[in-house]
A protein has these predicted regions:
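Non-catalytic positions within long, well-ordered alpha-helices that form the structural scaffold/packing
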Residues: 94-97, 200, 219
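Active-site rim beta-loop-alpha module in soluble metabolic enzymes
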Residues: 156-200
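His/Asp/Glu-rich mid-to-C-terminal helical/loop segments that flank catalytic regions of hydrolases
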Residues: 236-289
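Generic hydrophobic/aromatic pocket-lining and core-packing "Φ" positions
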Residues: 90, 196, 212-215
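General beta-strand structural signal in soluble alpha/beta enzymes
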Residues: 69-71, 101-105, 121, 176-179, ...
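Zn-dependent metallopeptidase/amidohydrolase metal-coordination segment
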Residues: 209-248
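Metabolite-binding pocket within alpha/beta catalytic cores that recognizes anionic/polar moieties
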Residues: 1-3, 18-153
């Protein structure tokens, strides 16, 4: 199940080496504007060579750390997953000073042990989208993204960011999984049962609609990226008579029930990420991009 509302927070702090540490965190919210968790909030309209991002950047502070909030599907949720301008979103965050991205995503479970209400720190993905541009290096802007980029996608997510999130989940005593493979589908429809079962055969644990190409694009920009999966349902693969299959109403209800703990995880994680020395990680990420160009 894909998220209904998705927000990205971007956290930046200046270090001695004069580069910013930013984390983008995506967030589902129904009837709640995440600007409420920001202090000194202000709105900034930006543009990129790929057009405008999904919404204005909302700048402020969380726990004393500079943050930026961006709604992936726009604040009114009028942009379906296929039409999100992923390239503009990630580039807008990069150009705002982002170097580290933490995302959250509502997702369905393909595995009995991954129960609704639990969280998962994603560690791999399977891309089953069909309509989305997967790269910045497609020749459309050779002045900025020349050549061809053959980006290695193992690991698919930043291990450093994952470790911080896992440690914070443990500290908060949350029910979570420290690994999960997620399959991203095109949407906006949910899977058929045959599709759901086929994804199980691929050894996917979870299913959503937006991790791809977002994780790939962040990596092409040299931005370490991690994602928190918020498990809301069991998709439609269960065959017991009392099985409840995915629908919008049940997903929203489960998300609302877990909003407080996800917010707590984000707010408590931000100072830990801010305290981490990202210099070598950023250098390694940027070197990987350079070495992936042909």
């Amino acid at each position: 199940m894909e998220q209904v509302y998705y927000y990205i927070y971007n956290v930046s702090i200046s270090f001695y080496y004069i580069f910013d540490v930013d984390f983008s965190s995506s967030f589902l919210c129904q009837g709640l504007d995440n600007v409420n968790i920001l202090e000194e909030a202000s709105f900034v309209e930006v543009d990129t060579i790929y057009g405008k991002p999904s919404d204005k950047l909302t700048c402020g502070k969380i726990a004393g750390v500079d943050c930026v909030l961006l709604s992936r599907h726009d604040r009114n949720h009028t942009t379906p997953p296929s039409n999100v301008n992923y390239r503009a979103n990630m580039l807008a965050l990069k150009e705002a000073g982002c170097t580290v991205v933490i995302a959250t995503t509502a997702c369905g479970s393909l595995n009995e042990s991954y129960a609704p209400g639990q969280l998962a720190i994603l560690d791999d993905f399977i891309d089953r989208t069909t309509k989305r541009t997967q790269t910045y290096f497609d020749g459309s802007h050779p002045e900025r993204f020349g050549r061809i980029c053959h980006m290695p996608m193992y690991p698919a997510f930043s291990e450093e960011l994952r470790a911080i999130l896992i440690a914070e989940c443990q500290e908060l005593a949350l029910s979570f999984h420290d690994k999960a493979t997620i399959v991203s589908i095109e949407g906006p429809r949910f899977s058929s049962r045959a599709e759901s079962k086929s994804f199980q055969q691929m050894h996917a644990h979870l299913i959503n609609m937006t991790t791809c190409p977002e994780a790939v694009l962040a990596k092409e920009l040299g931005m370490p990226y991690a994602s928190i999966g918020i498990i809301t349902d069991y998709d439609c693969w269960r065959e017991t008579k009392d099985a409840h299959h995915v629908d919008v109403e049940s997903v929203l209800a489960m998300f609302r029930a877990n909003l407080t703990k996800v917010t707590s995880l984000i707010v408590n994680t931000i100072p830990k990420v801010a305290a981490y020395d990202w210099k070598l990680v950023v250098e390694k990420s940027e070197k990987l991009v350079k070495n992936s160009l042909l």
